[in-house]
Amino acid sequence: MPLLEIKNVDISYGKNVTVKNVSLDLNAGEICSIVGESGSGKTTVIRAVLGLIAGGGKVTAGDIIYEGRSLLKLTPAEWRDLRGHDISMIFQDSGAMMNQTRLIGDSYVEYILTHEDISKKDAWAKGVEVIERMRLPDGDRIMRSYPFQLSGGQRQRVGIAMGMTYQPKLLLADEPTSALDVTTQAQIVRQFMELRDEYGTSIIIVTHNLGVAAYMGDKIVVMKRGEVVDQGKREYILHQSENPYTKLLLDAVPTLGGKRYV
């Protein structure tokens, strides 16, 4: 049984259906890359998995099944238990999601205390431990910093640390490398792969970067205007697909010496 199944899902804002008949599944320890142009519905789909569709959007058809149960039928209390523990999300710019006037440690401790009945001192120590596990040296200094005092790569690693605090089975990543320079992008991508290898974490990554999608994804889903127009194993999408839009995306990848590096 797949860890996650998205079955024929429509997502609507009022009477406007913006995501139409989307289906995909994800097995334990698998990485799925969702690619497509801006506005294609990629982010909306993964937000639906976590019950966090922005702007009043709702799932109006289909179902989202996680470990055999419908996420659309969860109570608020069940969502609180699930978010963070079983399913976590990494945002495009984790630093922008943090309160700029609070120490990172204060925000992190507050997050931990929503999930565990422990002392603030123990929560702080846990935050330091997880941050250092994410290859950020001197976790206590990071915890005592404000978000604006860190580089983009450091902020993103803090976001990954917070998302991985309870070693969730499913990690949703929304354009996690788009605001970073190429070197830092590569470091973050490698870190995601290590998380999968070390913890068996399943990952859905939304990206417009086909190179990132191809490097990370066991399977690739291609979206356009709110619909899935192509999907399959990585090798199929990159080398065998006859879908015109998939070919268009591949043709847009820069070449060097006549060779395309995806």
Language model regions located:
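The feature captures the beta-strand-to-loop junction immediately N-terminal to the Walker
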Residues: V35-E37
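A short, proline-enriched helix->beta-strand linker immediately N-terminal to the Walker B motif
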Residues: T165-K169
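ABC ATPase "signature
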Residues: Q231-G232
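Conserved ABC ATPase "signature" region
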Residues: S70, D122-R141, L250-D251
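Conserved ABC transporter NBD signature motif
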Residues: K58-S70
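A short, surface-exposed alpha-helical micro-motif characterized by mixed small hydrophobic
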Residues: A213-Y215
